[in-house]
C-alpha cells in the first residue's frame, strides 16, 4: 500500500499511543483535526486531507465518538521508524 510521508508520520505517532481529536459541523462532517502524541504535543503533519486519506484507507477508526486511533490494518501498514528522543 502506498503511504505518503505525512501519512506515515501520522500513523507512527498513532502507533506509539497518539490520538486524533476532531471537530464536526452541524451536518456531522469532520471539519478540523489535530493529532496529539502520547506526550501531548501536536503533530503539524496531520492535516484534514491526511486524515481523510487515512480514514478512506481504513487505517484509523473511532468508536462511540471518541478520538481516532490506529487499527490493526494501520499497524500492519506502518513501516518501522527510528525514534530520536
UniProtKB/Swiss-Prot annotation:
Query: What parts of the sequence cross the membrane?
Result: none
Highest taxon in the source lineage: Bacteria
Assigned protein family: Belongs to the UPF0386 family.
Protein name stated in the entry:
UPF0386 protein HCH_03746
Look up and give the organism this protein is from. Answer: Hahella chejuensis (strain KCTC 2396)
Amino acid at each position: 500500500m502506498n503511504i505518503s510521508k505525512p501519512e506515515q508520520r501520522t500513523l507512527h505517532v498513532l502507533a506509539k499511543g497518539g490520538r486524533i481529536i476532531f471537530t464536526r459541523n452541524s451536518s456531522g462532517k469532520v471539519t478540523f483535526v489535530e493529532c496529539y502524541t502520547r506526550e501531548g504535543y501536536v503533530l503539524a503533519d496531520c492535516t484534514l486531507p491526511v486524515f481523510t486519506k487515512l480514514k478512506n484507507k481504513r487505517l484509523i477508526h473511532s468508536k462511540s465518538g471518541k478520538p481516532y486511533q490506529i487499527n490493526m490494518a494501520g499497524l500492519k501498514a506502518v513501516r518501522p521508524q527510528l525514534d530520536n528522543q
